[in-house]
């Protein structure tokens, strides 16, 4: 009887010590994912904030390029209307919606910059060059923020799936795997170069 009681006591101690393994670490890892996502959102917002100034500058020189300008404005409006919560980071469809909206911004900005190439006075405008440089820098920041988010998500996902953290997670936390930011379909296509 004493041996059974002792064995039960030892078993309970082992179970409770295992479930405590990684409890705080997993929560800290999830917070790193949320912080990394906040950085992605901040850089996307920076790009969205640059667009009105860029459009206004181009409009002064290329007012008859109305269709291109409206495409940029509409893409910006759509992208800023797509909001993700912390729970959405585990939802592949929600992340896909955001990525599609951001892809439309990138595409319309590319068309706008192609239009700008047709106007030498616009290209020579110091304000336009400054905005273009800021936009390029922001695109680089977006890429870095996405990479950092994916790294934080990978560390978190690995942590919640490995033993004994998986036991702790399934018994106490019920944290869900975070999705990765993936390249959009257009970026996956290999460009054809013809001379």
Residue ranges and their predicted role:
Residues 2-195:
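A helix-centric hydrophobic-segment signal that preferentially recognizes long
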């Amino acid at each position: 009887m004493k041996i059974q009681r002792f064995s039960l006591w030892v078993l309970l101690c082992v179970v409770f010590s295992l479930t405590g393994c990684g409890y705080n670490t997993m929560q800290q890892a999830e917070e790193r994912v949320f912080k990394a996502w906040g950085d992605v959102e901040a850089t996307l917002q920076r790009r969205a904030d640059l667009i009105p100034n860029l459009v206004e500058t181009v409009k002064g020189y290329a007012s008859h390029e109305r269709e291109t300008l409206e495409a940029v404005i509409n893409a910006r409006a759509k992208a800023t209307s797509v909001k993700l919560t912390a729970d959405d980071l585990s939802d592949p469809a929600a992340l896909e919606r955001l990525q599609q909206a951001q892809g439309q911004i990138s595409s319309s900005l590319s068309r706008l910059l192609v239009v700008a190439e047709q106007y030498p006075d616009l290209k020579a405008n110091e304000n336009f060059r400054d905005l273009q440089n800021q936009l390029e820098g922001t695109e680089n920041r977006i890429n870095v923020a996405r990479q950092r988010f994916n790294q934080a998500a990978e560390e978190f996902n690995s942590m919640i799936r490995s033993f004994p953290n998986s036991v702790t997670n399934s018994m106490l936390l019920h944290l869900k795997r975070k999705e990765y930011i993936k390249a959009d379909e257009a970026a996956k296509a290999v460009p054809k170069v013809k001379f």
